[in-house]
Regions:
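Radical SAM enzyme [4Fe-4S]-AdoMet core and its adjacent flexible, acidic
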Residues: 108-256
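Flexible mid-to-C-terminal extensions adjoining Fe-S/redox cofactors in radical SAM and related proteins
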Residues: 243-314
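Short, flexible loop/turn elements at secondary-structure junctions
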Residues: 16, 65, 94, 124, ...
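N-terminal [4Fe-4S]-dependent radical SAM core
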Residues: 1-11, 209, 280-286
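Short cysteine clusters
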Residues: 18, 22-25, 236, 241, ...
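Conserved alpha-helical substructure of the radical SAM core
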Residues: 1-92, 97-105
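Residue-level signal for mature regions of secreted extracellular proteins and peptides
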Residues: 11, 15-18, 234, 293-296
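A general structural motif
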Residues: 7-9, 54-56, 85-87, 113-117, ...
């Protein structure tokens, strides 16, 4: 067992294609950088090998909109159930079809493949593109298919308690759906990434030369020397954090990638572990990269931007 990477969860970015274009979307920039969807056979192999080798607690499929490719999603979760992964999640915008029969068919197939958690994004942003009556039909179909846990997952701006036009709209939408026996997950906060940097600047925090925080403090991050979750990209690359890739499972066995992971052998990771964002800046300067003089909204944005600037110098 690798002391730096003890896999408890695996996530699949099935696709970065989407049938919406939400104004806050963080993943839209990935749409043209990857194949249309992950290879089904590769995904199956990864789930089988990782599920048999490690005691995984959960698996998730997401996107983009993963249910643009329901067959792939179902194959992934059927194998996950077969190897004993207990929590099998799909996060979706709920826009599977305009046809009620097709929506019910997809929900039935998801249930039969072993999906036991459906997380539906509902908020002011998604409902600019996804009709509420479709969301209702999707949620009802999931309940009828007896999927164990169905939840709403709203995105809040600044905080759930902040009184702004987007949060007010989100609360109105949730009110419209409250007759359904579906829990609210509590949701997440809008991240200063992707389209939010263009469309929602007025709601972003002030930029700082070195934003506060460290890996593990920020949602969806972990200390780089104590990773519990890996993400599989549509091209097979394996990420331990945003754009931090440790190899490609289509070229190297997934178990070998996991077992050989050593963040102290990756200079930028080593710098972050030992000295945080200041360490990353010092490392970047040795490579001829200067941080943005205007600063950054978050440590994640800072880390990603600096590493991408370094890659452009190659």
């Amino acid at each position: 067992m690798n002391k730096y990477l003890t896999v408890k969860r695996i996530e699949f970015a099935v696709t970065y294609l989407c049938n919406a274009r939400c104004r806050h979307c963080y993943s839209i920039h990935s749409e043209g950088a990857f194949p249309a969807h992950i290879d089904k056979s590769l995904a199956l192999e990864i789930v089988r090998k990782v599920g048999r080798k490690y005691k995984l607690e959960s698996i998730m499929t997401f996107g983009g909109e993963p249910l643009l490719f329901p067959e792939i999603v179902c194959v992934i979760h059927k194998e996950a159930a077969s190897v004993g992964i207990p929590l099998r999640e799909v996060i979706t915008n709920g826009y599977w079809s305009n046809n009620s029969g097709r929506i019910k068919e997809i929900a039935k197939n998801l249930a039969e493949s072993g999906v036991n958690s459906i997380i539906i994004s509902v908020d002011a942003f998604h409902q600019e593109h996804v009709p509420l009556d479709i969301i209702r039909k999707t949620a009802e179909a999931c309940l009828q298919a007896r999927i164990e846990d169905v939840s709403w997952d709203p995105c809040w701006v600044i905080s759930e308690d902040d009184d702004n036009r987007y949060n007010r709209k989100t609360k109105f939408i949730l009110k419209e759906l409250e007759d359904l026996p579906i829990r609210n997950s509590g949701g997440n906060m809008m991240e200063p990434e992707g389209l939010a940097l263009v469309n929602l600047k007025e709601f972003l925090p002030p930029r700082k030369k070195i934003p506060a925080g460290k890996c593990g403090d920020i949602p969806y991050t972990e200390p780089l020397d104590s990773i519990k979750c890996v993400c599989v990209e549509p091209d097979g690359r394996i990420a331990v954090c945003n754009d931090f890739y440790i190899g490609n499972a289509s070229k190297t066995d997934i178990v070998d990638l996991i077992e050989s992971y050593d963040p102290f052998k990756i200079p930028e990771m080593k710098a972050i572990i030992e000295n945080g964002m200041k360490g990353l800046i010092d490392w970047a300067r040795t490579k001829g990269v200067e941080p943005d003089p205007e600063g950054y909204y978050s440590i994640c944005q800072m880390c990603t931007n600096i590493r991408k600037s370094k890659q452009k110098l190659k």
